């Protein structure tokens, strides 16, 4: 992809060659256990300010249904979808991600 330079790709290849990808795979292997460990949170709401920031072309959005976030995010909530960005939005569009984060944080009131 145009957002990943050859140098960055070489870095990832070197690191995964050195360390393997067990950590990343274990996240998926442990998914059922994660649901079990967080079962007590079913129905809980988020009252702290929350920002949902994603790429509008992220295929995960198809089953995640971010439009339902306001059912659980009952405090101040903002959603930002970056057009044309995919799953790795922070790598694909770092300046826009940082700008959205800073804008969100600046809008918070200190308590």
Which residues does each PLM region occupy?
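Residues at alpha-helix caps and immediate loop-helix transition turns in enzyme cores, especially N-
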Residues: 24, 62-66, 93
């Amino acid at each position: 992809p145009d957002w990943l330079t050859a140098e960055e790709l070489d870095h990832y290849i070197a690191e995964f060659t050195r360390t393997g990808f067990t950590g990343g795979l274990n996240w998926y292997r442990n998914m059922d256990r994660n649901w079990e460990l967080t079962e007590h949170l079913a129905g809980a709401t988020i009252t702290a300010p929350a920002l949902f920031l994603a790429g509008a072309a992220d295929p995960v959005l198809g089953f995640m249904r971010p439009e339902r976030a306001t059912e659980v995010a009952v405090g101040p909530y903002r959603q930002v979808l970056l057009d044309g960005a995919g799953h790795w939005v922070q790598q694909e569009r770092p300046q826009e991600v940082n700008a959205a984060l800073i804008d969100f944080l600046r809008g918070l009131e200190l308590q």
